[in-house]
């Protein structure tokens, strides 16, 4: 019985977990994408990056993606380097 439990736990750990995250997508220079209130532009941009959806966050005038894969680049604490 214990072997079955250990084997099941080891199998789950070996498979890994594919999570999703939300955030501002960035280009190669760590700059956010400006949207100027265009939700369709942001939704298309986010879906190209394999997100579930996206919208224009109007306070920052930047695209925000929902459900991005874990390996997608999002805005962090670094500056934009144009």
UniProtKB/Swiss-Prot annotation:
Protein name stated in the entry: Toxin Pg8
Job description of the protein: Alpha toxins bind voltage-independently at site-3 of sodium channels (Nav) and inhibit the inactivation of the activated channels, thereby blocking neuronal transmission.
Cysteine-cysteine disulfides: 31-80, 35-56, 42-63, 46-65
One function term, GO molecular function aspect: toxin activity
Organism, scientific name: Parabuthus granulatus
Keywords of the record: Disulfide bond, Ion channel impairing toxin, Neurotoxin, Secreted, Signal, Toxin, Voltage-gated sodium channel impairing toxin
PROSITE patterns recorded: LCN_CSAB
Subcellular location, principal: secreted
Sequence similarity: Belongs to the long (4 C-C) scorpion toxin superfamily. Sodium channel inhibitor family. Alpha subfamily.
């Amino acid at each position: 019985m214990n072997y079955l439990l250990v084997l099941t736990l080891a199998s789950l750990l070996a498979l890994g977990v594919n999570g999703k995250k939300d955030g501002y997508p960035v280009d190669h220079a760590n700059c956010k994408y400006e949207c100027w209130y265009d939700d369709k532009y942001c939704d298309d941009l986010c879906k190209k990056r394999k997100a579930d959806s996206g919208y224009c966050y109007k306070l920052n005038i930047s695209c925000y993606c929902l459900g991005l894969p874990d390996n997608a680049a999002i805005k962090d604490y670094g500056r934009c380097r144009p």
